[in-house]
Amino acid sequence: MQGKIVQLGKDTAVYGLSTILGRLINFLIVPFYANVLLPAENGVISNLYAYIAFAFVMYCYGMEAAYMRFVSTLDIGDRKQNFTVPFLSLFTTSILVSLAIHFQAPFISRCIGLNTSESGLIQYAGWILCFDTLSVIPFASLRMERKAKVFASLKLFNIVTNVALNLVFILGFHFRADGVFLANLCASAAT
């Protein structure tokens, strides 16, 4: 019993510290954006990330919780089936919805108050959602297998990659708001 409590404490510390560190790193990039990008660009970035947060919930449609429930009890199927079914479901719907977003980006841009010239940002957002969704079940699997250090390392790798690519794209290649989303897309695809 005491061993399980100690293990829970260690896992909680790893998950908690990695989450806090990740948020701190992401928080530190906000002043960079404020000093390098125009206020209008920061507004577009903020609005689009708000839409991404809402859309991510719909992209995942509760599959992470369902996966964790079924894999913890194995009421139906074995571990492999309990991984494959939700992953393929999310894979299929993510690809289809992201393709729809990609091809309807000018229309979506107008609907949310962006210029059609900014429809590339919508396309980036659609693919960010796709790649982030594809990582949901593998990350849940790491949690269920109690691989907290691997989980935290991959999450931090994603954040550090995102921040580093932001610096490269914005400072090195002089991208604007598109550099923010391209960096996020590359980081999401890498993890």
What residues fall within each predicted segment?
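Hydrophobic alpha-helical transmembrane segments
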Residues: 122-126, 152-191
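Helix-terminus/linker motif at the lipid-water interface of multi-pass membrane proteins
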Residues: 25-41, 109-112, 168-173
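Transmembrane-helix boundary and interhelical linker motifs in polytopic inner-membrane proteins
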Residues: 2-6, 37-39, 55-90, 108-109, ...
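N-terminal membrane topogenesis motif
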Residues: 1-27, 83-84, 88
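Interfacial/gating helices of multi-pass transporter permease domains
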Residues: 30-54, 118-120, 177-182
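Residue-level recognition of pore/gate-forming positions within transmembrane alpha-helices
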Residues: 19, 23, 50-53, 90, ...
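Small-residue-rich midsections of specific transmembrane alpha-helices
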Residues: 19, 25-29, 46-72, 90, ...
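Short membrane-interface helical motifs at transmembrane helix boundaries
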Residues: 96-114
